[in-house]
Amino acid sequence: MHTNAAAPDRAHRLTYVLYDNLATPFNCVMLALALLLLALDAHADLWFFFPVLLNAGLRIGYDLSAQHAIRSVCSRGGQRTEPLSMRRRPTELKAGLSHMLVVLMFVAVPLAAWKGFALVRHGSAPREAVIYAAGMIASLVPAAMVLLISASLLICARELRKRRVVAASLYSVELLAHCDAVCFSSDALDAFAESKTLSRLREEGLALYFFHSTEADASDPFICDARTLRTPDEYSSAVQAFSVFSHAGGAERAALVQELQAAGHTVAMVGSLDIDAAALHRADCALCPYNGARSAVLQAHLVLLSDTVNALPAAVLEGRRAINNATRTGELFVKKSLCSFVLYLLALIVRLPYPMTQLHWSFTGAFTVIIPAIVLAFERQYQPVHGRFVSNVFYEAAPGALLHVAYLLLAVLLSRVLGLTSEMRLTFCVLAASAAGLAVLWHICRPYDRLRTGLCALMTLLLSAALVLFRGRLGLVDLPPAGAYAVSLLGMLAYPLQHVSVRIVERVGRAVRCRGKKRRLAVPGLLERDEGC
């Protein structure tokens, strides 16, 4: 009887996991490109689809294994049902990554179509134009970045599993890192809380609130009877003045969580009872012990597999690690995408020759993007998280993209001035792109430690050696003395000019923020007091 009743639930959960991980705009566009190339019998150009398949398989595999782990431990704890967090509200990292990929695809698809039509007008075969356009889209939309971010999240999820915490989905790992307030249901907390854990949470900058269903300790100076709260103003005043609430029922707990969110907090909720379900559902991050009520476990993003909350500080740090690594990885890949987009656009509008082929982009990118991103994606970075993922990635990637574009355009112009041949121009551009890529890598890896310093030094040596060893296969030739001097000068100035690019982007960003504030603020005298405006 129980097996028959559970079968539809398992099918529903499997359908949800497949839909959540497969039915994304990124996967749909990549699948359409792959099918198009298959129809054109261009199997050699399907390399970009393998990271997409690996990423989808990794996410689906983790989500299903997490459900199985939660289901197993809950059945040992007396649960008859199979819990799973089914809330469709995406996490900050997941939503930001999806929006960023949509923006890149929104830019890449029209640009690739424009380039394809231009090739057809100039006499190229339609099949070749379509294959070239598909390659443009694949190069502008970094599928490898998505795979590396998922792999980094998986490492963090495994670290949490060692501490007896299971994330209901792969992207749930990051949720607790965004929170600056944690609400505890004291009915569950009193049995297993430790003062050291609560002290560590406070040290990490988290404000703690406690909800009691009965009378709390009268000696506590910060106690509020939740039964006396009626209006939103009373709730707003209460969360600012008190941290302990007695006689808090389910409605009161949900209202208090909502009021904390309205006050600008990102709220995590730890609860195990039926009366916690509404507050858990409303919280930005829901945590529940495995032996909690079914209605509470169903809302959990993170399930505690032991009767303690000692793993909460570790969950905060692992979430920060996941977000910081994803941001660092995104900077490297988005920098290349922005640079490629600008160069493709200039090649179409101004009719400048495109500086390098996809082979040369891949070759230099292997040492300045791919290998460093793999290493940095698994680094332990526990700095607090600030801002939003998309804005942080684009803001940090913009200086590197600006330096790359400036260097490649300068290489093309100097090649014309010096009268270099097409082979010499290609060599000039490859060397300029290598210098810019290494400068960006050295800048991104600050502050330096042994790992980052060794990584940057190793990539510099390997790229320099590879350019010499594979110069024949890459089509590189010797430059005349003037060209060699120009390349040497660009190489020496690359790192200082990267700092100049950062300053330019900072000033532009500050000007944009000030203009936005001027539009929002109509009261005279307010803008003069705003820093930087």
Model-found features: residue ranges?
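Juxtamembrane/interface segments at transmembrane-helix termini
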Residues: 63-67, 159, 447-450, 454, ...
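Hydrophobic alpha-helical transmembrane segments
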Residues: 40, 47-77, 89-181, 211-212, ...
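Alpha-helical transmembrane segments
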Residues: 59, 373, 437-441, 467, ...
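Structural signature of FAD isoalloxazine-binding scaffolds in flavoprotein oxidoreductases
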Residues: 72, 76, 278-282, 297-298
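Hydrophobic core segments of alpha-helical transmembrane domains in multi-pass membrane proteins
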Residues: 33, 46-55, 132-133, 151, ...
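Non-lumenal N-terminal regulatory segments of integral membrane proteins
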Residues: 1-111, 213, 227-230, 242, ...
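Cytosolic catalytic headpiece
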Residues: 102, 125, 130, 171-285, ...
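Membrane-embedded transport module
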Residues: 90, 99-108, 115, 132, ...
